[in-house]
Amino acid sequence: MPELPEVKTVILHLKKLILDKTISKIEIFIPKMIKEISSEEFKKYLENETIFNIENEGKFIVFFLSNNKIMLSHLRMEGGYNFYSKKRQKEIHDRLIFHFTDGSSLHYHDSRMFGTFHFRNSENYLKIKPLSLVAPVPWKIDLDEFFKLLKRKKTAIKKILLDQQIIAGLGNIYVDETLFASKVHPEFKANQLSLEQVKLILKNATRILQESTKLGGSSIRSYTSLNEKEGSFQNFLQVHTKFNKPCPNCGELIQKIKLGGRGTYFCKKCQQLN
């Protein structure tokens, strides 16, 4: 699943290729991916509009268009974009195609079809679900308020860090890496963390997300950025995907468990539960 660094990398490439382009036609092959309105309404609202900016809110890609229109895109598990400067045939996993007036096109591909698209107006898009539910990213979180919130949670800290309504941008990869850097066991109860531990978790989450963004994200399993470009942060992962390999700090073999349905990697010596 693309996490915050991967989403930001996609946006960086999109900005270089499609800003100031006008949508002439939208082809929608999987209507269920368009939420709240029909696919025909979606096309009517966005065709003939110009894309002038692209940003993110958590893991959502936010396309700002002319006439105060906004399109939200969430890549979910397998979503991604390919840009073509000339006419290109539909590929097997292409689900939407945005054609531009200059003959270029942007293809959204998604083998599992979990991705979503939403239409919004700019004056209220942050106040309506799903964006109204998206929490701040780690570097924008108030430490004291976050600590108070965790004191009310008896859940494993990994599950908390994966909750986009509590803290945005972290997925399975970066939660494992953050907790390893913070020497906190993924099953450690959130309400038992000290203020210093919480501060360290936010600090490491910020550092790791920003370092990964600079390297184009982590290309493991199916993730590639725009037009199949790979990131390189996977070369610097300390524990995630490192089952039975030596811990880079102590040499103990990295463990793997299932936590909340997610494969979870940690060092039992560096990240002690008791």
Curated annotation (Swiss-Prot):
Pfam families per UniProt: Fapy_DNA_glyco (PF01149), H2TH (PF06831), zf-FPG_IleRS (PF06827)
Record CDD domains: EcFpg-like_N
Any one Gene Ontology BP term: base-excision repair
Signal peptide: none
PROSITE patterns: FPG_CAT, ZF_FPG_1, ZF_FPG_2
Known EC number: 3.2.2.23, 4.2.99.18
Function according to Swiss-Prot or TrEMBL: Involved in base excision repair of DNA damaged by oxidation or by mutagenic agents. Acts as a DNA glycosylase that recognizes and removes damaged bases. Has a preference for oxidized purines, such as 7,8-dihydro-8-oxoguanine (8-oxoG). Has AP (apurinic/apyrimidinic) lyase activity and introduces nicks in the DNA strand. Cleaves the DNA backbone by beta-delta elimination to generate a single-strand break at the site of the removed base with both 3'- and 5'-phosphates.
Assembly notes: Monomer.
SUPFAM superfamilies in UniProt: Glucocorticoid receptor-like (DNA-binding domain), N-terminal domain of MutM-like DNA repair proteins, S13-like H2TH domain
Binding annotation for DNA: 93, 112, 153
Keywords: DNA damage, DNA repair, DNA-binding, Glycosidase, Hydrolase, Lyase, Metal-binding, Multifunctional enzyme, Zinc, Zinc-finger
Location of the active site: 2 (schiff-base intermediate with dna), 3 (proton donor), 59 (proton donor), 262 (proton donor)
Reactions that this protein is recorded to catalyse: Hydrolysis of DNA containing ring-opened 7-methylguanine residues, releasing 2,6-diamino-4-hydroxy-5-(N-methyl)formamidopyrimidine; 2'-deoxyribonucleotide-(2'-deoxyribose 5'-phosphate)-2'-deoxyribonucleotide-DNA = a 3'-end 2'-deoxyribonucleotide-(2,3-dehydro-2,3-deoxyribose 5'-phosphate)-DNA + a 5'-end 5'-phospho-2'-deoxyribonucleoside-DNA + H(+)
Keyword DNA repair: yes
InterPro entries, sorted: DNA_glyclase/AP_lyase_DNA-bd, DNA_glyclase_Znf_dom_DNA_BS, Formamido-pyr_DNA_Glyclase, FPG_cat, MutM-like_N-ter, Ribosomal_uS13-like_H2TH, Znf_DNA_glyclase/AP_lyase, Znf_FPG/IleRS
Protein name: Formamidopyrimidine-DNA glycosylase
FPG-type zinc finger segments: 238-272
Cofactor or coenzyme needed: Zn(2+)
Assigned protein family: Belongs to the FPG family.
Cofactor note: Binds 1 zinc ion per subunit.
One term of GO molecular function: damaged DNA binding
